[in-house]
């Protein structure tokens, strides 16, 4: 799997108002980008990736909108991996791995447990990267293709 996102030849950035309709728009944009990049919609990573993306955008809309009127999604792909990030301007950085026990049952019933179960189950990675000013973050997901 490619390790440097800068090396991924396909990229798309989408910024949306932090409102419920952002979830559907982010997902539909992902479907369009994947099709344009030649990634088969029946690839085993695509449906889980779309669910992960939907959960992350939902979390930004639900929990960060009070401080972040916009959510930005970065889509990227290469020959052997798919990556995306969801960025908002809320400073809270959720402990991604704390939401997942590795037993197939997350510690909670929330979206982050689902995100981590799907990501790790596909052999992917997840990381939270804080903004330099400490007032926002991006959650990056990378999945092998």
Give the location of each predicted region.
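Conserved beta-strand-loop-beta-strand hairpin that lines the nucleotide-binding pocket
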Residues: 1-17, 61-145
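Phosphate/oxyanion-binding active-site loops and adjacent basic polyanion-contact surfaces
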Residues: 22-23
């Amino acid at each position: 799997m490619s390790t440097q996102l800068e090396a991924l030849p396909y990229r798309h950035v989408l910024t949306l108002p932090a409102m419920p309709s952002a979830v559907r728009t982010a997902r539909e944009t992902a479907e369009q980008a994947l099709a344009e990049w030649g990634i088969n919609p029946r690839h085993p990573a695509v449906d889980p990736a779309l669910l992960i993306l939907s959960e992350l955008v939902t979390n930004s809309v639900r929990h960060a909108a009070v401080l972040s009127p916009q959510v930005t999604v970065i889509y990227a792909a290469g020959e052997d991996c798919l990556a995306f990030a969801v960025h908002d301007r809320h400073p809270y950085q959720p402990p991604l791995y704390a939401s997942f026990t590795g037993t197939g049952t997350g510690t909670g019933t929330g979206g982050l447990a689902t995100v981590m179960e799907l990501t790790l189950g596909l052999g992917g990675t997840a990381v939270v990267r804080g903004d330099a000013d400490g007032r926002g973050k991006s959650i990056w997901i990378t999945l092998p293709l």
